[in-house]
Regions:
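Conserved catalytic core of nucleic-acid polymerases
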Residues: 200, 204, 392-519, 530, ...
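Polymerase palm active-site segment centered on the conserved acidic dipeptide of motif C
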Residues: 218-253, 430-432, 436, 441, ...
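Short active-site loop/helix that positions an aromatic residue
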Residues: 62-73, 85-92, 260-268, 364-379
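Short hydrophobic beta-strand that contains or immediately precedes a catalytic carboxylate
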Residues: 78-79, 358-362, 561
């Protein structure tokens, strides 16, 4: 056991394959202590140390925590150096070399898989830091595992990097109206670290699928499971034929937008493009358009969520698994295997086994509420105290609710044409602080000026300056990056809030037979027993109140969620 490590204190851990654990921590005088513990069962040792309640520090959850999660160990607290490097320095990588370099103000190094350089070869084999300050690529490739002393030195370097990161996030401004004891960027670093751990857990646990229900849905939508490529092609032609039968003339390739536009002209429908939203108004009066739109839904399922998807991504234990990421460019979580875009038609199959249920919570109007908090707009914050904030916005704008919703969304996404244009003028008059905040972000994007989200994530727009300078300030490129920045400061902050909420829910579920099984931008799914569902629902809701109390501190913004207990995801309304 590491001597002197208290609850919540950083404890760097490196798993040495076949040898044990390397640990590093600070003693009472601030010095770094390190040791290697030889053990045939490092996971069991971590579980023992977990009783002390340390904040585990690792280079990345994917590299260290995956083995712990697979063995049933769910750490309570962690600091993920890779995740914090993405937050603090705006990195697109989270490997040890990039995180170390960023923490020390060095240029981002090449990935360690490349050829060794003269600087790598010039040093001694045990020189972990090169003459230029970068980490040795031999060590990045795993040379630290050669002996116990090297492994403990690697853990000490990990702890040093964490300390530099903590100093960095604590130095960032806390933009809340009422700051707390711990600055918001530091709290964001903690929740981003937990999100990286949660991503590993989501990959391990998977999403429960009722295979019989799924197979019935797929059969009804795209046809029986094909036994050959010929059968698959025949099923595709059969789906196409349903649409062709509704139109006069020869069949066309329904996957070619230009040909589909010509096809629509045969029934008197002239449209500039064939996007589904543009065709939907015609569906009620035109059976041909209705058939085309139904075909598109079936085609999407067939090509993205068909039989091959089910065979590839759903395990023998009837769990849908994909690769999860804790943050993309603006901070949102990502997932493969279609987890973030599962069609509504297939959601009845997201259903745990008998005796278990899903607690589903959907954040209400989260991005507009976040805009109210991060912009400091008192009038918009007042609207955000209501269950439905679009209702008071409509009254303030003198419009109906649908127009008010369009105006708020258009403001965040930079839309200025159509019905949004007139409504935006009223937004400027009624919510000047929110609109000024969005315009400032857009201008920064157009000029290639770095931004930080409310929680401290660096959006590295300065890397675009050469491109923007060549294109010009009024170019399509400049407008595109401006709109990206305008939305990213809201969407990124909303992602930070969501992950802070998810981390709080995860902590609240400790000891319960319950696991988070899906994170979907503004929606959370927790699988639990029917007996514990009510208590778990209470944890989810109290976690949102708790998170909102410090994340929105002083803004007056209220967060709301629609929480329900359901047997399948489709039952949630």
């Amino acid at each position: 056991m590491p001597e002197g490590v208290g609850a919540g204190e950083p404890l760097a851990v490196v798993v040495v394959p076949g040898r044990g654990l390397a640990l590093a921590w600070r003693d009472a005088d601030g010095g770094i202590r390190r040791e290697h513990v030889a053990t045939a069962d490092p996971v069991a040792l971590v579980a023992d140390i977990e009783t002390l309640g340390p904040r585990w520090v690792w280079w990345s959850a994917r590299g260290t925590a995956a083995a712990l999660v697979a063995a049933g160990v769910r750490p309570r607290a962690c600091w993920d150096v890779g995740a914090v490097a993405r937050l603090l320095h705006g990195l697109s990588r989270d490997d040890a070399g990039a995180a170390w370099a960023a923490a020390h103000g060095l240029a981002e190094p090449p990935l360690p898989e490349g050829e060794l350089t003269l600087l790598d070869l010039a040093g001694e084999a045990d020189d972990v830091v090169r003459a230029d300050g970068q980490l040795s690529r031999e060590w990045l490739r795993g040379a630290w595992a050669a002996d116990p002393d090297a492994a403990s030195r690697w853990a000490a370097l990990l702890l040093q990097t964490q300390a530099l990161q903590e100093t960095g996030v604590r130095a960032l401004p806390d933009r809340r109206a009422t700051a707390g004891t711990s600055p918001l960027p530091y709290l964001t670093a903690l929740s981003e670290s937990m999100a990286a751990l949660l991503a590993v857990e989501l990959e391990h646990d998977g999403l429960p699928i009722d295979r019989a229900v799924l197979e019935a849905l797929l059969t009804a939508t795209v046809g029986p499971r094909p036994r050959s490529e010929a059968e698959e092609a025949a099923a595709r032609r059969a789906r196409d034929a349903v649409v062709w039968a509704r139109f006069p003339g020869e069949p066309v390739d329904l996957r070619n937008p230009a040909l589909v536009r010509d096809l629509l002209a045969r029934v008197g429908i002239d449209v500039p493009d064939t996007r589904s939203w543009r065709l939907e108004p015609y569906a009620e009066s035109s059976p041909a358009v209705a058939a085309l739109l139904a075909w598109r839904k079936a085609e999407r399922i067939a090509t993205t969520y068909g039989w091959s998807w089910a065979e590839r991504d759903i395990g023998a234990d009837d769990r849908l698994r994909g690769v999860w990421g804790a943050s993309e460019g603006a901070g949102r979580m990502t997932a493969s295997a279609g987890l973030h875009n599962l069609p509504a038609e297939l959601r009845p199959a997201v259903r745990p086994r008998e005796g278990r249920v899903l607690v589903r919570a959907d954040l209400g109007q989260i991005e507009p509420r976040v805009l109210a908090a991060v912009s400091g707009d008192a009038a918009l914050a007042a609207a955000a105290r209501e269950d439905d904030m679009y209702a008071p916005v409509a009254r303030a704008l003198g419009s109906d609710r649908p127009t008010a919703k369009v105006a708020v969304l258009a403001a965040m996404y930079g839309q200025t044409s159509g019905p949004a244009g007139a409504a935006l003028k009223d937004m400027d008059r009624t919510y000047p602080s929110a609109m000024a905040f969005l315009r400032a972000a857009e201008e920064a994007g157009r000029r290639g000026v770095d931004l930080r989200t409310y929680g401290g994530r660096l959006l590295r727009l300065s890397t675009l300056r050469d491109v923007l300078a060549e294109a010009g300030p009024e170019s399509t490129v400049a407008h595109s990056y401006g709109r990206f920045a305008r939305n990213a400061v809201v969407q990124g902050a909303a992602a930070e809030l969501f992950k802070a909420w998810a981390a709080t829910v995860r902590a609240g579920l400790a000891g319960a037979d319950a696991r988070i099984v899906l994170c979907l931008h503004d929606e959370l799914l927790v699988e639990t027993t029917a007996a514990e569902a009510s208590r778990v629902g209470g944890i989810v809701e109290s976690s949102l109140r708790s998170t909102g109390s410090w994340w929105c501190a002083g803004s007056g913004v209220r967060l709301v969620a629609d929480t329900s207990v359901v047997r399948s995801w489709a039952d949630a309304k």
